[in-house]
Swiss-Prot record:
GO molecular function, one term: sodium:proton antiporter activity
Example GO biological process: regulation of pH
Top-level division of the source organism's lineage: Bacteria
Family indicated by similarity: Belongs to the NhaA Na(+)/H(+) (TC 2.A.33) antiporter family.
Gene name per UniProt: nhaA
Topology class, membrane: Multi-pass membrane protein
Protein name: Na(+)/H(+) antiporter NhaA
Localisation per UniProt entry: Cell inner membrane
Cellular component terms per the entry's GO annotation: plasma membrane
Record's keyword terms, sorted: Antiport, Cell inner membrane, Cell membrane, Ion transport, Membrane, Sodium, Sodium transport, Transmembrane, Transmembrane helix, Transport
Transmembrane regions listed in the UniProt entry: 27-47, 78-98, 114-134, 143-163, 172-192, 201-221, 222-242, 249-269, 316-336, 346-366, 388-408, 421-441
Record flagged with keyword Ion transport: yes
NCBIfam families membership: NhaA
């Protein structure tokens, strides 16, 4: 029997490496198609909430779920598990993406990051001011943050529908802006929607953070081991009064961006595995083949930074599992008891719709224009103001994040439903505007290229 051909192994190793380091491309791909799943989940929730099965839909989320451990009982309803526990995983992935962008992405270079940072700030301030102008001197001012959020999945999903004719720079700026938007949303939740702060829980959360740092210091690389300190942080934040799902952001931002240190270098492990596979008669020795392949997998794993490895594993679960479940649990608004003749409800709906549909693009393009004209930053190559406006429309798709904030802002069920309807309408209008304007944007770019080619011929 001849030895394994050496030319096949590098191809396999190259394939594995390419898969591991295409994190950004995979992120965009998953986010884009998960937008469709989110839309279906939201539509299903609305159908159930306004059908003969509405009572079943409502009672489902009030189903108690928990466990007993001796005399210790832990039990919450299903709605709590979705919004406070499951969403922690979403914020974990968001935190990791923020960490990566700061380390090696669009936010790593401050000059490059100025445009999306300024745009995101404008896209938060304008919708908030619009909301406050409609609800000034009322009891509903605490809902000002509802129209400030951006749903990355939906925004990138609409962009994906427009095809590959959209410049790559536009994808990068939209993603960077949405990530900064997430950072601002996290800060808003932490500082404005955390009530009745109890300092006793802070010590528990700090202990959990210290345990994470200790695990990292001794070189523990398995993500499963960090569930314990994560649970401690989550419990501490809940006692403190801060929304416990922000545990995900803390863990995500603490995830190492460099490969974990090992006793044997990953390249040495891969080299040893290659030597084993290149030995004669290896095809007949299943034990040696299995051992070599295990070493290759370990070497590959050790070469990849935990922030990339864990995010790559969790991201599809969040995009196709956590977010659709959240949408199905919270987008079900019953129109039966909704009354637009109520002045309070009408103002909440109107301010959220206008904040998302008009405030977002207006804030983004105004802030960007002022930043560029003042010399603070420049537009990236091949980026035009029409492209910035397209980003503004897509950023107005608040959906899941806006619904999440509305649930923290409103305790009154009528006003909460009003805010949700405003989010659904505003996000829907923004999506349609983004899709329609995107088609116009593509056509304009195509015509410009045709004219450029004709001028070149002349």
């Amino acid at each position: 029997m001849s030895a394994l051909s050496s030319n096949r192994l590098p191809n396999r190793a190259s394939l594995v490496t390419n898969r591991a380091f295409s994190a950004l491309e995979g992120f965009l791909h998953v986010e884009a198609f998960s937008g469709i799943v989110l839309l279906l989940a939201a539509a299903a929730a609305l159908i159930f909430a306004n059908s003969q099965y509405a009572s079943v839909y409502e009672s489902l989320w009030h189903t108690p779920l928990g466990f007993n451990f001796g005399h210790f009982t832990l039990s919450w309803d299903l709605h709590f598990w979705v919004n406070d526990a499951l969403m922690t995983v979403f914020f974990l992935v968001a935190g990791m993406e923020i960490r990566r962008e700061i380390h090696e992405g669009a936010l790593a270079d401050f000059k490059q990051a100025i445009l999306p940072i300024v745009s995101a700030i404008g896209g938060v301030c304008f919708p908030a001011l619009i909301y406050l102008s409609f609800n000034f001197n009322s009891e509903h001012t605490h809902g000002w943050a509802v129209p400030t959020a951006t749903d990355i999945a939906f925004a990138l999903g609409i962009l994906a529908l427009l095809g590959k004719k959209i410049p790559a720079n536009l994808h990068v700026i939209l993603l960077s802006l949405a990530i900064i938007d997430d950072i601002i949303a996290v800060l808003i939740i932490a500082f404005f929607y955390s009530t009745n702060i109890d300092p006793s829980g802070l010590a528990i959360a700090i202990a959990g953070i210290a345990l994470v740092l200790f695990f990292q210091w001794i070189g523990l690389a398995s993500a499963w081991l960090y569930i314990l300190p994560g649970a401690i942080i989550w419990w501490g934040l809940m006692i403190t009064g801060v929304h416990p799902s922000l545990t995900g952001v803390i863990l995500g931002m603490m995830t190492p961006v460099f490969p974990t240190r090992t006793l044997v270098a990953p390249l040495t492990i891969l080299s040893n595995a290659m030597q084993i596979l290149q030995e004669k008669n290896i095809k007949t020795d299943l034990h040696h083949i299995s051992t070599a392949l295990k070493k290759m997998r370990k070497g590959q794993r050790d070469m990849i930074a935990p922030v990339i490895r864990v995010q790559k594993t969790l991201h599809p679960w969040v995009a196709y599992g956590v977010m659709p479940i959240f949408a199905f649990a919270n987008a079900g608004v019953s129109f039966a008891n909704f009354d637009l003749s109520s002045h309070e409800s009408f103002l909440v709906v109107l301010s959220v719709v206008i904040g998302l549909f008009i405030g977002k693009p207006l804030g983004i393009i105004t802030a960007s224009y002022l930043a560029v004209k003042s010399g603070l930053c420049r537009l990236p190559p091949h980026m035009t103001w029409t492209g910035i406006l397209l980003i503004g429309f897509l950023a107005g798709i608040g959906f899941t994040m806006s619904i999440f904030v509305s649930m923290l802002a409103f305790k009154d069920i009528v006003l909460l439903d009003s805010a949700k309807i405003g989010v659904l309408c505003g996000s829907g209008l923004s999506a349609l505007a983004g899709l329609g304007y995107g088609l116009i944007y593509i056509k304009r770019n195509k015509n410009k290229k045709v004219l450029h080619n004709l001028n070149g011929i002349k």
